[in-house]
């Protein structure tokens, strides 16, 4: 006797209702997909089917106390269907639109007007793959990516048996800001689930002996869901095809969104003001060994080489664009040599006189290579001093890469390669995208010297990251540099493989972006739309990581 499959009450109830049959309300088609709208006991559903290839059940409206009445309303614009659904707690208006200009998709928006101040202790998920006989318990497939933290509310999966294809579910969290404000909640990892119960789990106040009482207001229309569901006929594929498909499907969803209006900023004036502040503010700089160095943070932390090189590279770019000399940049460059370890032949993170509260031998893996990237940038622009430091550090950079098998830990001792921190959490993964950054540095070395062995090192690093799929992103800017490295390798070698591998880096990068405009807390005071969160599990955006990704 086979082992019973564990399932939630919601999944079992749906399975039973589909077997018995629901009350049909409407039907329309989307390519070879038929979409039946039906009323169950406590929900109204859209059942999307492909002939003999399975389907998908989408919960359009959850009705506490049961579905009292469903009426079809007049549609407007691109709407396929508009419904008014009544239940014990009030009225919900559901609109369904469709588009197949690039990839077929439907958009389902549900607006709830409660008849009384409504506490929401729980709302069920809204997406169920359907197997043979419309049974969600017989659906076989795999989730490739789901929402991380407060990033985009998406889940990307494929239904293999039956061969329905791939699905990208994208919850437009921007439309739900009123719901979050009324209930005092955040959509933290709200889109995901355990197969086959997937989709959006609306956030609710934490439950306890004395739970918060933050109701949805009576008589006020509040959007509780604005879901975009994109379909693709293909399902199982290698990581490159899967990544490209994800980007295509995400692009189809993105085109349906109302992006924030472009605002004018005088970036040139801001750049000049920032330069003045760096030069004049005593909190910005510190003197060591007779040289000027930039503080990593305002009036705090010891100077480190990554910060110095990032500032110098940016100042060089601005000087070239403005066609003017910036003496402050040259002043900073004069102190770079103190970071170079002549014995190890590498750029060290800290100056030799760093305080005892720091481990002068400890280095995060990406800190070893990011300064070299900016040195390479200056070297390729003709800076002889930068070239000397860059080329003088390449052998050690390669030695470290080979020692770790092109799979770097979080932190290690620079003199012995002793690992200090192996993994970011219990998944055993280190800084998974450092290989992309290393590859970019190796491509720079190849362009500077013409030596094929540097190109070979770049290839090895990219190859070592195969099959990381959506776990590739450790830190946003490193993933972005990895995508750029793949594109450089493609142009140099003319090998299609590297173009395809760039999609893996890009897919992992965009998986970690917030494609919505939050009005929660302090976020209401600034734009976060399409911002990249700094780390794979970070609940914040950082100016450096965002700007470096853009660069």
Question: PLM ranges: what are they?
Answer:
Residues 499-551:
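Long alpha-helical HEAT/HEAT-like repeat alpha-solenoid scaffolds in very large eukaryotic proteins
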Residues 2-392:
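Carbohydrate-recognition beta-sandwich/jelly-roll modules
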Residues 298-320, 360-379, 429-444, 475-491, ...:
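Well-ordered alpha-helical segments within folded domains of soluble proteins
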Residues 380-448:
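Active-site lining segments of carbohydrate-active enzymes
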Residues 205, 273-300, 337-361, 399-424, ...:
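Glycine- and aromatic-rich loop/turn segments at beta-sheet edges
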Residues 381, 448-452, 489-497:
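Inter-helical turn/loop segments and adjacent helix faces that build the functional surface
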Residues 317, 377, 399, 403, ...:
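Positions within ordered alpha-helical repeat solenoids
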Residues 327-333, 387-392, 452-460, 496-504:
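Short sequence/structural elements of tandem HEAT/ARM alpha-solenoid repeats
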């Amino acid at each position: 006797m086979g082992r019973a499959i564990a399932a939630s009450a919601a999944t079992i109830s749906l399975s039973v209702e589909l077997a018995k049959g629901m009350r049909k309300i409407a039907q329309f088609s989307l390519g070879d997909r038929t979409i039946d709208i039906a009323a169950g006991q406590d929900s109204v559903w859209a059942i999307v089917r492909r002939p003999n290839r399975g389907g998908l059940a989408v919960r359009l409206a959850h009705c506490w106390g049961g579905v009292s009445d469903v009426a079809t309303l007049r549609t407007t614009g691109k709407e396929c269907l508009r419904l008014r659904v009544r239940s014990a707690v009030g009225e919900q208006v559901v609109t369904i639109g469709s588009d197949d200009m690039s990839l077929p998709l439907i958009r389902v928006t549900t607006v709830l007007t409660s008849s009384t101040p409504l506490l929401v202790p729980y709302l069920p998920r809204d997406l169920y793959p359907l197997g043979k006989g419309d049974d969600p318990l017989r659906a076989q497939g795999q989730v490739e990516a789901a929402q991380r933290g407060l990033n985009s509310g998406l889940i990307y999966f494929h239904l293999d048996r039956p061969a329905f294809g791939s699905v990208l579910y994208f919850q437009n969290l921007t439309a739900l800001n009123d719901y979050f404000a009324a209930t005092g909640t955040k959509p933290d990892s709200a889109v995901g689930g355990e197969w086959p119960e997937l989709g959006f789990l609306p956030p609710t106040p934490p439950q306890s002996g004395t739970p918060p009482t933050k109701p949805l207001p009576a008589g006020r229309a509040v959007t509780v869901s604005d879901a975009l569901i994109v379909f693709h006929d293909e399902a199982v594929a290698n990581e490159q095809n899967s990544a490209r498909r994800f980007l295509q499907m995400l692009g189809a969803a993105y085109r349906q969104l109302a992006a924030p209006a472009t605002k004018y900023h005088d970036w040139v004036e801001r750049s000049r003001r920032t330069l003045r502040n760096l030069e004049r503010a005593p909190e910005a700089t510190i003197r060591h060994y007779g040289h000027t160095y930039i503080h990593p943070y305002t009036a705090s932390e010891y100077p480190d080489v990554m910060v110095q090189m990032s500032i110098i590279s940016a100042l060089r770019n601005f000087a070239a664009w403005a066609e003017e000399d910036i003496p402050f940049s040259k002043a900073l460059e004069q102190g770079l040599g103190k970071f170079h370890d002549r014995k190890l032949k590498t750029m060290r993170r800290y100056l030799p006189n760093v305080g005892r509260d720091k481990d002068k031998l400890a280095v995060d893996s990406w800190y070893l290579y990011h300064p070299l990237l900016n040195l390479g940038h200056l070297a390729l622009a003709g800076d002889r001093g930068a070239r000397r430091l860059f080329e003088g550090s390449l052998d050690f950079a390669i030695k470290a890469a080979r020692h770790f098998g092109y799979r770097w830990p979080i932190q290690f001792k620079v003199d012995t390669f002793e690992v200090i921190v192996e993994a970011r959490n219990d998944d055993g993964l280190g800084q998974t995208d450092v290989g992309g950054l290393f590859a970019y540095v190796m491509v720079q070395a190849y362009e500077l010297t013409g030596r094929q062995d540097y190109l070979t090192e770049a290839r090895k690093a990219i190859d070592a990251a195969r099959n990381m799929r959506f776990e590739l992103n450790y830190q946003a800017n490193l993933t972005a540099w990895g995508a750029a490295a793949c594109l450089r390798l493609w142009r140099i070698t003319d090998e299609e493989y590297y173009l395809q591998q760039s999609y893996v880096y890009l897919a992992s990068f965009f998986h970690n972006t917030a494609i919505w405009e939050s009005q929660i807390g302090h976020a209401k005071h600034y734009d976060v739309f399409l911002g990249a969160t700094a780390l794979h599990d970070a609940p914040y955006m950082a100016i450096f990581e965002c700007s470096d990704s853009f660069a």
